[in-house]
Amino acid sequence: MMQQYFKIKEENKDSILFFRLGDFYEMFYDDAKLASKELELTLTGRDCGQAERAPMCGVPFHSCEGYIARLVAKGYKVAICEQTEDPAKAKGLVKRDIIRVITPGTVMESSMLDESKNNYICCMYSKNKTIGLCFCDISTGELYATEIRGNDSYNVLTNQLTSYNPREILIGGDIVKLKELPKFIKAKLSAGVEMLEDEKFDESVCTDVVKSQFADEYSTVSDKSVVVCVLGALLSYLRDTQKTGLERINHIEFYKENQYMSLDYNTQRNLCLLYTSPSPRDRQKS
């Protein structure tokens, strides 16, 4: 069984692995040490045939949401490894697989969400001095996209981030050259940041992904390559983590960044506009 665990954990190194054993989700080794500290769980051990017992802790599967919510709120990813066959009918070791990876920006459960505001995941990518930017709330299906260009791109970008206040940010391309951006995110946002490999933004691949998701709406962004790239990279990330279709996300709301009045962080804070309206675009309207 532990060989099965090691194989699955190897494929999910950046997540806390909730490994289903009977009526519990168990965590082992470093995951167990971390979870026991963050969730105030008793750290025990399991004999795994090695010189020392494996550190271990667990939570009941029927009440796991509260524990997962606490970890995700702290910025951790949680990979759910479920039994994929009936143990009573299994021949030998019960088959297990990852059924979902829950991240700060991919929470779906109402019990884990604040109903007063959206829970956005953001993806941004820059190429040839143009920034593609999109925000998605997978719990509602809302998806907004825009492109930013010009000498004031950095300020426009940070204003957009302030307005949407995403919980998770995916970054790629020349965005990494914006040296002040990490400081801004750390100081002004409560968001985890993940760097995506360049191939995730491959225009050909992203075009196919966007077309497959929005067959009737691809034409609205087809001439905006960086937007196609961020949409494709985001959708691929969501498919990889959710392990299911994204039927709820069925419309692209493309807007021009100069279509609405843009307010900086301090102005929005002073006007009490931060985190109070269900629609970030409403907060930008003049």
What do the PLM-derived regions correspond to, one by one?
Residues 1-277, 281-283:
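Charged catalytic and DNA/RNA-contacting regions of genome-maintenance
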